Each structure stands twice: as structure tokens, then as C-alpha cells.
Amino acid sequence: MKRKYLYIAPLLAFIAAGCEPSIKDEINSGTYYAGEADFSSYVAIGNSLTAGYMDGTLYRSGQQNSFPNILAQQFKVVGGGPFTQPPLDDDTNDVGGMLINGNPLPGFDTKLVMNMSTSSPENKKGTVTLDVNKRAQKAYHNAGVPGAKTFHLLAPGYGSMSNLLAGKANPYFVRTATSDETTVMADVMTLKPTFFTNWIGANDVLAYATSGGEGLDQNEQANGTDLTQYGGNDITHVGVFKMAYEGIVNTLVSGGAKGVVATVPDVTTIPFFTTVPYNPITSAAIVQPGQNEDAVFGQLNLLIGMFKEVLTQLGQGDRLQLLDKTKANPLLIQDKTLDNLEPQLNVILKMLVDSGKFPIKLSDQEIAFIAKGFGQARHATAKDLMLLTSRAQIGGALPSTGKPEMDAMLKKGITYPIDDKFVLNVVEQEKVQAATNAFNSIIKNVANEKGLAVADMNDLLRKAVSGLRVEDGQIYTADYFKGMGNLNTVMFSLDGVHLNPRGYAFIAAEILRVINKHYKANIPLVNPAVYPGPTLVLQN
């Protein structure tokens, strides 16, 4: 199931270079001006997209290419002041990740790299040295906090170590919070901002989407405005979002600062949701050397056909389809929006096994296991979005049953459904879209009321799906790294959610265009082409 890529050796030196831009343009400050803006104290509000998070983590060299840091360098030409970012000097191996008291913090792995020897993205091998306990307790101009939702920026204790141990704080803010009870906004306002960028809001819907809809849409809950009832993967209630967003912006402009607010991207257009096809099951993918193609497909269809026949008796036969050796066949997935037919399947399967009509003898426990899996199973359609994380599931074996013939029979995505959390179905997509539209309406209304500039990242990244041409003539795309073919155009990092250095430069360039137009400024743009793309290594 792995793709094979060809790489060109002479490019390796360029590819393996550090994350600093390799070309510096000479800029004559006399030809540029700040217009109606004052960049003497620029602060950046946001989440991981603001922090410079990429390749699945926040690491030292990656942070240097955060879009706020890129902007700050351009602002210096027109009177911009110092710009500080949370220190990552203790990330001595430049691999990111996170420790707590010297032990790995679950879910905080090292950065992803493309291993050229295996043609696959892998976590970089290396020792994690970044520790939550190294607390700077200082406000920084880049106030992007990976994982933060809108309401988190106003929450006291979001940087408290005791709250972190209770699962109620953020390790990145714990490292910088000036006190246990401070808020992100309280700390950033001590820097007396004169200009800001505010790109917060994506996580208010993204966490739900990247979990395959495992959370709740709080807009559908009776107590949807009660934050104590929220789970990490929930969609934020529109009322909560509005109150938090207005509070953030009101705080930022309270001292006279001007700025740019950015809309929430349609997360379903990013590579995390568009890379894995719904129909990757082909003859080439499942027939091994030496196997007979007809025999393989015949055996698979014997099993699928039996389940289809059972579901037909229950009026749901269209949930499944037989595999065609000449076509790209869809994945078998779980869909929790379907009626659960587990009880009925349990009864019918037991009858088939007892009568000897099932291919192998199964115990009652094994029958229950299969009935549970197929109770809400169906074949995927083109409308389903397979998560990037589903790649590792396809064709994978289930936990051993102790019965070799059963283990060989059930393969994830082929003859046993991939779990619902690896799929964003149509119902879940509609919830994501509704929330995104509502959030962006709020963002634009607040910007209009306060006279702020708007960088429409939703529109920009949606257009990038088909390719966007910029001043250097290059076309940049919102797709996943596919090899040398899109090495110089891909904007997303290997996690499929966050941008790579080139992508963040692309964002910075768009924000500069917005600033120049709205605030009648003339600030030099940046050239994304001189920033690195995916991180490739010969071996890991």
C-alpha cells in the first residue's frame, strides 16, 4: 500500500539544508512606509498555525519560520520593533516533542520527516529534550499556543502546572505563563501592542474533524455554552465563540492597536482529509506475488457476499458491494450515523455458523465480535473523507483471535470496517461546514465593527486546492507531498494539517498584501520560493 518515489541525488544538499531561507533580498527601507499602522510592538495571537507548528510538533528550527516571525522581519523595514518567540533553546536535537519531569508527555511525538529509504513519513529518531518544567514565565510577542481554542485565550489557569496535571492546561502555555492564574491575553497585553495579527478559531472545529467526528457539536447540546461540559474534540458553540472572539479583539484594540484578523480555513480541504482516496482497494494492492487474482477476489467476495446477503434480509443490502478486480474498490468503513444492526446480525450469523453455511467455525464470542464490527459497516463513497491517519489502518490485521483462518480472513478496510474515527462522513462534514461558516461570519463582523483588516484564509486555502500563482510565477498547492513532482509547490508539512516553512511564507505574503491595502502601507512582500518545503532525510 506504500507509494514509491524517485529522488534526485544532486538535490539532497538543498533539501537537507536548514529551515532558514537560503536567499536574502536587499531591501532599501527608504522606498517603504508603514502607512496608517504602527509596528513598533507587534504581537501575534493564535494557535499552532501562529506558533510555527509543523510536521506534527513545535521544534526549534521550525519555529523560526512561523508566519509572525516572517512578518516581523518585514515590519522592521518600516519601523517594526523587537519580536520575541517562546524560547525553544532546550530543544537541543531540534526534534520537538515534549517531556514532563523528564518523561515523555503522551501525544507529543518528535517531528515527522520523509524517510527516503522507505518512502514514508516517520517520526524523527532522536532524544526529546524540551520539557514543560523549563518555565520562562515571560510574555512573548508570538502568543500562538498550539491546541488553543478561542475561549482558552481568556481562561485563567491555562498555564498552570497543577491544571496541566489535571488535564486542564496547555503545556506550551505552561512554559511561558507569567503566573499560574494569568491568561494568554493578559500576558500579551503587557507588551503594549500597537499592531496585531489574530488567527484564532481553527481548533474550535478542527479537533472535531481530525478526530473523525468523535466529539460533540456543542451547538446541538442543551448545555452547549457550559464550558465545564466540553470535551477536547467538541465543536465550540457559536455563542461561546462569539463571546470569546469579541473579548479577544476588544482586549487587543483597547490600547489603540490596529491589526489583521484571519478567517478559519475550511479544514476539509487540507491534505489531512484529501490525501487518502476512498477507493484504494485494487488488484495491485491486495494480490501478492504468486497468488491467483481470481482466487483472491473470489475468496474476498465469498465473505463480503455472505454479509451482503444477511444485510439484504434486513433491508440494508446496499451498504456493501462486491469487489471488482478491474476497478478501484472502496474501503469498508464504520459509520455511526447508520442504524446499528448488531443484535440482528448476531442472531443470523449464529444460525449460519450452526448450520455450517459460514466459511469457518466461530465461537459465540467471535460471532459477537464480527456482528459488532458489521453492525454499522458500509462501503465508503466519494463523499466520505478518509483521514490521513487511516493509511496505516488499510489492510492491517485485527488483534489475533488465536484462529489463523479467521485472522487471515479479516483485514481492516477490506473485509472488516475501519473504525469511524478514521473517516469524516457527510453528516460530520456538514457540522464542520456550518460551524466554520458561523465562525467566519463572526470574525468578519467583528473586524468590520473595529475597522480591522481581514485576511480571508478560508478563501485563500480553498483556492490553493487547485493551485495559486503568486508574484514569482510559481503555482503553490494545498496538497500533500508526493515526491519530486510537487517538492517545490507543496505548502503543507508532513502532518497534513499545518503548513511548512514555504506555506507559512505564503501566508505571511498574503497578510502583507492585506496590510498594504487596508492601512495604505508599502511593506516588502516575501518570496515563498526561498523558504524550504518538506523535510527529507536519506534514512531515519
Which functions belong to the PLM regions below?
Residues K2-Y5, A9-S41, Y278, A521-N540:
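Bacterial Sec-dependent N-terminal signal peptides
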Residues F67, L71, F481-L538:
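Histidine-centered active-site loop/cap adjacent to the catalytic His
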Residues S40-G56:
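Catalytic nucleophile-elbow at a beta strand-turn-alpha helix junction centered on a G-D-S/GDSL motif
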Residues V95-G107, S120, V132, F151-A177, ...:
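Surface-exposed intrinsically disordered loops and tails
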Residues I270-G451, A455-N488, R502:
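Acidic, Ser/Thr/Gly/Pro-rich low-complexity segments that form flexible
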Residues L191, A244-V261, A435-A455:
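A structural motif corresponding to the C-terminal end of an alpha-helix
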Residues L58-M243, T268, F273, L387-L388, ...:
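Conserved SGNH/GDSL esterase-like catalytic core that processes O-acyl groups on lipids
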Residues G30-D38, A177-T194, V249-S254:
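Short amphipathic alpha-helices and their capping/turn segments at secondary-structure boundaries
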